[in-house]
A protein has these predicted regions:
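Gly/Pro/Ser/Thr-rich low-complexity, intrinsically disordered segments predominantly at protein N-termini
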Residues: 1-201
């Protein structure tokens, strides 16, 4: 049996609930009703379940840094590892989101609507590279999400690629490549020291 885990196809024994899937295939709302033994973090891309791979130290530190350093205005909230429902068979789980405070309607919220998302951040790993660089940006831009950051590891340090939506064609245009320091504007000014060493010193 073939499973997709972290973007790689692997021969593995899948649990009964995951294969062949429900009649008609997986839909976004079904992720809220997976059995207790299912992984905590699962994405739905084009109707396929993606089991997210184990977290690296780089990704953990990068998410911690952004959670700590992003200082959005009062009408926006930083959310970590929450999904966004883009369509019937599309429910990716970005690493970081900035969402409207009004979207936090309940502590039971498990997913956001694209119109409530201001910024998406994806931290690239070897397993997720193709999805993070190609597949997901197209889906995010088609959904009208205005800002996207893609973070890569380069020589043990982060590089942040920033993008803004060109609304007429629903495509992202690059606005910068940031090393050592992230300075950009996403409706408010962002200035973040990208030195991860200060988080563990």
């Amino acid at each position: 049996m073939i499973a997709e885990v972290g973007g790689n196809q692997m021969s593995t024994a899948l649990p009964d609930w995951s294969y062949p899937g429900p009649p008609g295939g997986w839909t976004a709302d079904m992720l809220d009703h997976l059995p207790p033994g299912a992984p905590r973090h699962v994405e739905l891309i084009d109707g396929s379940l993606i089991m997210l791979s184990p977290q690296s130290a780089f990704r953990m530190l990068m998410l911690r840094l952004l959670e700590r350093e992003l200082d959005p205005p009062d009408d926006l909230v930083v959310a970590r590892q929450m999904s966004v429902t883009l369509g019937l068979r599309q429910r990716p789980e970005p690493d970081i989101l900035l969402v409207k405070r009004t979207a936090m309607t309940s502590l039971a919220t498990t997913s956001f609507r694209p119109e409530d998302v201001h910024l998406i951040v994806e931290v690239v790993s070897p397993e997720s590279a193709e999805r993070d660089r190609t597949t997901k940006p197209i889906k995010y831009s088609n959904a009208g999400i205005r800002f996207l950051w893609r973070i890569e590891q380069e020589d043990e340090a982060p590089v942040v690629y920033t993008f803004e939506l060109e609304p007429a064609v629903r495509a992202y245009v690059p606005t910068g490549i940031h090393r050592k320091r992230l300075r950009t504007s996403i409706g408010f000014e962002v200035d973040v020291d990208l030195d991860l060493g200060r988080l563990i010193s």
